[in-house]
């Protein structure tokens, strides 16, 4: 992108609505509750021929540095320093407040270009608020309606004037993003070939878990900076925020998500939106790290989150966080491994890594587990190998007989990866018990080294070419 723009202003003036308008998607949560946005969220904006990076920020308020609002303010100030231009959004409908005046003074001290934006200008009675904005001393306000998309041409012209025409329309090579990845991964490849794993491809990783498990602290430790808002308060993260960094030459795109509580406890509309946003992050990710609090692991919600991730078909890795608070580590680790095997039978062989997001202990091992799990998630097995394996499995443990006739498994092939899915042609597929399916899945895990990822097997009844034809007499 040619330049970076930060959207700033006090809470509830419509910053996230404007952000969603500029990126063309509902990426940021929007609600009437003030202070919905807490972390800074970047996005790729397009506006009437302009392309640039846009950063949504938390509402600026006067607050003590150590308070949650104070830490949110520090994140917003970091975005202002990072940006080339700030869009200072005020509420023309409800008018200015002393906070607006203080923020205008702060932006002037920064010495960077500012475009004053009078949002909600479509509302009745907004003229007074629009003209009051002149008193902020930041030039002529640009009237817009972020909700209805009005005034976008004027906003573009104001940005071009502030940043300069050459900078605004600078050409550069832009990498292709938002590529639609077909679920039929490997489609078009020879089914008897086993493609090599591409360890240079960017990897999407979602970090999920219960509130206050240390998800944001973990990502900050990976990045080596306080990029995400953290603190002792549970439920700080609301939006799913994505950040990028390199690990041993590979681009990693990580999604921090809101803590996921039991549905019965989620009553507020805003928290429901946050959890829905976390679910979208899980579906967009390739590998999901489920963060457990090692001091109170295997709560019911922990188990439900793991089950959700596997049902969504994602590769899963467990991270037992806060390991720096554990005293008898060997005994606790042995107990965690026993409980993992016993309480998560559907995730047999899942990789589980003790870590400390606070100190950074164990993070290299966690990253290697993420890469190894993604490798398995992308695995493809040749049809020839699968059918030799299927024959051996039936010899060792034949399928059951139905009405005196044994079910025959005739042919097997892998129909997709991400996660691995297989199709078996057989007789009487409707009569094959679930226990035999589990036997085959466990065999695939053991014989083809496929731990920790969902494996799906679909059965298709082999057609009888003589069915329905009259017998000769």
From Swiss-Prot:
Residues 379-463 form the KH-like domain. Keywords: GTP-binding, Nucleotide-binding, Repeat, Ribosome biogenesis. Gene3D superfamilies: 3.30.300.20, P-loop containing nucleotide triphosphate hydrolases (3.40.50.300). GO terms for biological process: ribosome biogenesis. GTP 1 binds at residues 9-16, 56-60, 119-122. InterPro entries: G_ENGA, GTP-bd, GTPase_Der, KH_dom-like, KH_dom-like_a/b, P-loop_NTPase, Small_GTP-bd. Transmembrane segments: none annotated. CDD domains: EngA1, EngA2. Residues 3-167, 203-378 form the EngA-type G domain. Associates with the 50S ribosomal subunit. This is GTPase Der. It comes from Rhizobium leguminosarum bv. trifolii (strain WSM2304). The lineage of its organism: Bacteria, Pseudomonadati, Pseudomonadota, Alphaproteobacteria, Hyphomicrobiales.
């Amino acid at each position: 992108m040619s330049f970076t723009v930060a959207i700033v202003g006090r809470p509830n003036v419509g910053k996230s609505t404007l952000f969603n308008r500029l990126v063309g998607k509902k990426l940021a949560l929007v609600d009437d509750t003030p202070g919905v946005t807490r972390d800074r969220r970047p996005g790729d904006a397009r506006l009437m021929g302009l392309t640039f990076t846009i950063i949504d920020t938390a509402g600026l308020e006067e607050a003590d540095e150590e308070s949650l609002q104070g830490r949110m303010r520090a994140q917003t100030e970091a975005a202002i320093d990072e940006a080339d231009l700030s869009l200072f959004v005020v509420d023309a409908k409800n008018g200015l407040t002393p906070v607006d005046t203080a923020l205008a003074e702060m932006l002037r001290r920064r010495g960077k270009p500012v475009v004053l934006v009078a949002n909600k200008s479509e509302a009745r009675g907004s003229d007074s608020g629009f003209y009051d904005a002149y008193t902020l001393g930041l030039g002529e306000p640009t009237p817009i309606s972020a909700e209805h998309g009005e005034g976008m041409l004027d906003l573009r012209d104001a940005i071009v004037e502030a940043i300069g025409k050459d900078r605004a329309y600078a050409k550069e090579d832009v990498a292709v993003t938002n590529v639609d990845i077909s679920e039929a991964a490997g489609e078009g490849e020879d089914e008897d070939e086993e493609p090599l794993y591409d360890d240079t491809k960017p990897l999407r990783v979602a970090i999920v878990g219960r509130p206050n498990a240390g998800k944001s602290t973990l990502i900050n430790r990976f990045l080596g900076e306080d990029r995400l808002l953290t603190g002792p308060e549970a439920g700080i993260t609301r939006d799913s925020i994505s950040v990028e960094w390199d690990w041993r030459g590979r681009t990693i795109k990580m999604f921090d998500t809101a803590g996921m509580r039991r549905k019965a406890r989620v009553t507020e509309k805003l928290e429901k939106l946050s959890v829905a946003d976390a679910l979208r992050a899980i579906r967009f990710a390739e590998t999901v790290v489920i963060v457990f609090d090692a001091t109170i692991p295997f709560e019911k919600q922990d188990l439900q989150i793991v089950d959700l991730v596997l049902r969504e078909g994602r590769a899963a890795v467990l991270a037992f966080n806060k390991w720096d608070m554990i005293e008898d580590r060997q005994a606790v680790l042995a107990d965690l491994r026993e409980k993992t095997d016993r309480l998560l039978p559907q995730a047999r062989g899942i990789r589980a890594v003790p870590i400390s997001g606070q100190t950074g202990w164990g993070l290299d091992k966690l990253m290697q587990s993420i890469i190894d799990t993604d490798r398995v998630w992308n695995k493809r097995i040749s049809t020839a190998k699968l059918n030799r394996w299927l024959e051996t499995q039936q010899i060792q443990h034949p399928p059951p007989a139905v009405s005196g006739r044994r079910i025959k498994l005739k042919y097997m092939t892998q129909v997709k990866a991400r996660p691995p899915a297989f199709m078996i042609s057989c007789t009487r597929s409707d009569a094959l018990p679930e226990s035999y399916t589990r036997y085959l899945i466990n065999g695939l895990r053991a014989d083809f080294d496929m731990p920790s990822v969902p494996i799906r097997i679909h059965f298709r009844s082999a057609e009888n070419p003589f069915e329905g034809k009259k017998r000769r007499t």
